[in-house]
Amino acid sequence: MTRVDLNADMGESFGPWKMGDDDSLLKIITSANIACGFHAGDPDVMAKTMALAAENGVGIGAHPGFPDLQGFGRRNMKVPHDSLRNLVRYQLGAALGMARAVGTQVRHLKLHGALANMCSVDQDMARACYQGALDVDPDIIIMVLAVTKQEQAVRELGCKWVGEIFADRAYNDDGTLVDRALPGAVIHDPDLAGPRMLKMVRAGAIITESGKHLETSVDTICLHGDGPTAVQIARSVRACLEEGGVSVTAFER
């Protein structure tokens, strides 16, 4: 039976300001990418989200991003590679410490927002970020945007990794994500997202906006926890996959 992981970005609330319905998502997904305080989140939110993930049997991932709370980590920043390594080391270190404190562990790491998008087209930048993570935990699983420079970087490093596709984002023909500023870049319709993911999993490929198939290993499917229909999309994707004979389960370390 085909198996695939279902992940979501979360832990992005800050103080009294709430973003996303993490409690509901954690009952549907199998992996959680938890913000590390730079683009979103705070220590209390991180601790609570990790504890809830562990309670629900959901695999925990560190989700480092640029230091940009106001821009939610979605604005490009020019950062030297040495600083990028330290940026990732710092955030992963915090995640590992918090996970241990609440009685669980971090299994994987996934870059956030603009940092991830920039690394999807710049292999040297991706390598710097991932080397920073491996310096802290050589056994960490790196979650990468499949078929992009991120995947090339982890293949070069020879580390553990899984390939990710998106349930709620449209694709360019090179495997990168369509710019959020463009119409149709973000998918909000659960009735579209679920069947679309089943089609890609069965094809073993990313299907771009032009209809091009980019063959890849579909190890995990992501949806953004901050979207207005995130919970509905998660339910739709999981239901469509399971009805289509796909087992939704966490990937193995």
UniProtKB/Swiss-Prot annotation:
InterPro entries recorded: Glyco_hydro/deAcase_b/a-brl, LamB/YcsF/PxpA-like
GO annotation (BP), single: carbohydrate metabolic process
- Give the matching Pfam families: LamB_YcsF
UniProt keywords (A-Z) are: ATP-binding, Hydrolase, Nucleotide-binding
Catalysed transformations (reactions): 5-oxo-L-proline + ATP + 2 H2O = L-glutamate + ADP + phosphate + H(+)
Question: What Enzyme Commission number does this protein have?
Answer: 3.5.2.9
A molecular-function term among this protein's GO annotations:
5-oxoprolinase (ATP-hydrolyzing) activity
Functional summary from the UniProt entry: Catalyzes the cleavage of 5-oxoproline to form L-glutamate coupled to the hydrolysis of ATP to ADP and inorganic phosphate.
Under the subunit heading, UniProt states: Forms a complex composed of PxpA, PxpB and PxpC.
**PANTHER family documented for this protein:** 5-OXOPROLINASE SUBUNIT A, UNCHARACTERIZED PROTEIN YBGL-RELATED
Record family assignment? Belongs to the LamB/PxpA family.
Entry-linked NCBIfam families: PRK05406.1-3, PRK05406.1-5
Q: What is this protein called?
A: 5-oxoprolinase subunit A
Species annotation? Ruegeria pomeroyi (strain ATCC 700808 / DSM 15171 / DSS-3)
